[in-house]
């Protein structure tokens, strides 16, 4: 499978690069994607939610009224869960939402996400990102040249590049990350994925 290679001016270089079929050309596995995204979203949760149960409420323990004959529900003290301001029954407690996911499943999910992008013509390969200094204007110009300025953009670099990161930081819908941080959720959430030629080589090393 071959795709055209562009430069950051949006010009076709006349060269093509071959995408690895075992990564970019597989039949996407939706269940693997679901599990990987579920784990990612679960790991974003702080898990610090907490409500007070009956033993944790401070207040009088005097019984409000007689047990029978009042015509209403039986209730004890002011901390009763049936009263406004009372305790909560089986309320949330601090917990860790992490769950284990096998490495093979995560790898399959990432391959599936990238394959979806290829199937939807939402993957662009560029020669390289050469930003001499952090400049938002240059990054915006690049998105316009590639005709992706109106889409959520994910730029995947082979390694960290401070100039590119800082140039894209203030642009809504633009996200920059390295191959080592390749993430199924972010790939799927992007309207277009932009890779460099070196990024493709790095992805081959990680996902094969």
UniProtKB/Swiss-Prot annotation:
Recite the UniProt keywords alphabetically: Ribonucleoprotein, Ribosomal protein, RNA-binding, rRNA-binding
Q: What segment(s) does the record annotate as region Disordered?
A: 44-79
Any one Gene Ontology MF annotation carried by this entry is: rRNA binding
Tell me, what is an example of a GO biological process annotation in this record?
A: translation
GO cellular component annotations, sorted alphabetically? ribonucleoprotein complex; ribosome
**PANTHER family noted in UniProt:** 50S RIBOSOMAL PROTEIN L4, LARGE RIBOSOMAL SUBUNIT PROTEIN UL4M
Subunit-level organization: Part of the 50S ribosomal subunit.
Q: What does the record give as the function of this protein?
A: One of the primary rRNA binding proteins, this protein initially binds near the 5'-end of the 23S rRNA. It is important during the early stages of 50S assembly. It makes multiple contacts with different domains of the 23S rRNA in the assembled 50S subunit and ribosome. Forms part of the polypeptide exit tunnel.
Q: Its family?
A: Belongs to the universal ribosomal protein uL4 family.
What is the name attached to this protein's record? Large ribosomal subunit protein uL4
Organism, by scientific name, is Bacteroides thetaiotaomicron (strain ATCC 29148 / DSM 2079 / JCM 5827 / CCUG 10774 / NCTC 10582 / VPI-5482 / E50)
Mind giving the lineage of the organism this protein is from?
Answer: Bacteria, Pseudomonadati, Bacteroidota, Bacteroidia, Bacteroidales
């Amino acid at each position: 499978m071959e795709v055209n290679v562009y430069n950051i001016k949006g010009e076709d270089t006349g060269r093509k690069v071959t995408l690895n079929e075992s990564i970019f050309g597989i039949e996407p596995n939706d269940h693997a994607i679901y599990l990987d995204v579920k784990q990612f979203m679960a790991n974003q949760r702080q898990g610090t939610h907490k409500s007070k149960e009956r033993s944790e409420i401070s207040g009088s323990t005097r019984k409000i009224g007689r047990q029978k004959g009042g015509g209403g529900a039986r209730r004890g003290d002011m901390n009763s869960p049936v009263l406004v301001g009372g305790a909560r029954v089986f309320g949330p407690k601090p917990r860790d939402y992490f769950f284990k996911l096998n490495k093979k499943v995560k790898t399959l999910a990432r391959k599936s996400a990238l394959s979806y992008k290829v199937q939807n013509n939402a993957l662009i390969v560029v020669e390289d990102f050469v930003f001499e200094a952090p400049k938002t204007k240059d990054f915006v110009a690049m998105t316009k040249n590639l005709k992706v300025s109106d889409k959520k953009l994910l730029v995947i670099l082979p390694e960290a590049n401070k100039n590119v990161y800082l140039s894209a930081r203030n642009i809504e819908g633009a996200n920059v990350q390295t191959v080592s941080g390749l993430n199924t959720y972010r790939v799927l959430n992007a309207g277009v994925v932009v890779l460099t030629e070196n990024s493709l080589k790095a992805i081959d090393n990680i996902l094969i």
